[in-house]
Amino acid sequence: MQGRLSAWLVKHELVHRSLGFDYQGIETLQIKPEDWHSIAVISYVYGYNYLRSQCAYDVAPGGLLASVYHLTRIQYGVDQPEEVCIKVFAKRRNPRIPSVFWIWKSADFQERESYDMLGISYDNHPRLKRILMPESWIGWPLRKDYIAPNFYEIQDAH
């Protein structure tokens, strides 16, 4: 079984892999980083006009990093919008994924957070810098191989 976007991508010979459907019937597609920008543009033109969320996670210690996009197709007069989940996996060493900021402006802070916490560089993002951690922070705190710095917090004794 294929979702509508997946069937459209197959029809137009665009490389992707279906990872199945979640409990709500939303299909998850895997896209290669080098194909992501063109498929993101195609998705927008196809009608996925809203980026509901973007997040990232560390798949396994020493393994791949994943950037996840939840896209929604919002149409006037449609009560149940169509949704799709896109996963883009990047190599741990120098992870690079094209930014979708220029397609969906809501990707701005979300891609910055993924950069700040996991070190994924989003190519062509206009302000890719740390958003939660200080600029001087070393490392990527949400990576599974991250070693926390050895410091102690002074606490009030009450």
From Swiss-Prot:
Its main location: plastid. It is a peripheral membrane protein. GO terms for cellular component: chloroplast thylakoid membrane. It is found in: Plastid, Chloroplast thylakoid membrane. Keywords: Chloroplast, Membrane, NAD, NADP, Plastid, Plastoquinone, Quinone, Thylakoid, Translocase, Transport. One of its GO terms (biological process) is photosynthesis, light reaction. It catalyses: a plastoquinone + NADH + (n+1) H(+)(in) = a plastoquinol + NAD(+) + n H(+)(out); a plastoquinone + NADPH + (n+1) H(+)(in) = a plastoquinol + NADP(+) + n H(+)(out). GO terms for molecular function: NADH dehydrogenase (ubiquinone) activity; quinone binding. It comes from the Eukaryota. InterPro entries: NADH_DH_suC, NADH_quin_OxRdtase_su_C/D-like, NADH_UbQ_OxRdtase_30kDa_su, NADH_UbQ_OxRdtase_CS. Pfam families: Complex1_30kDa. The keyword Lipid biosynthesis does not apply. Its EC number is 7.1.1.-. NDH is composed of at least 16 different subunits, 5 of which are encoded in the nucleus. NDH shuttles electrons from NAD(P)H:plastoquinone, via FMN and iron-sulfur (Fe-S) centers, to quinones in the photosynthetic chain and possibly in a chloroplast respiratory chain. The immediate electron acceptor for the enzyme in this species is believed to be plastoquinone. Couples the redox reaction to proton translocation, and thus conserves the redox energy in a proton gradient. NCBIfam families: PRK12494.1. Belongs to the complex I 30 kDa subunit family. This is NAD(P)H-quinone oxidoreductase subunit J, chloroplastic.
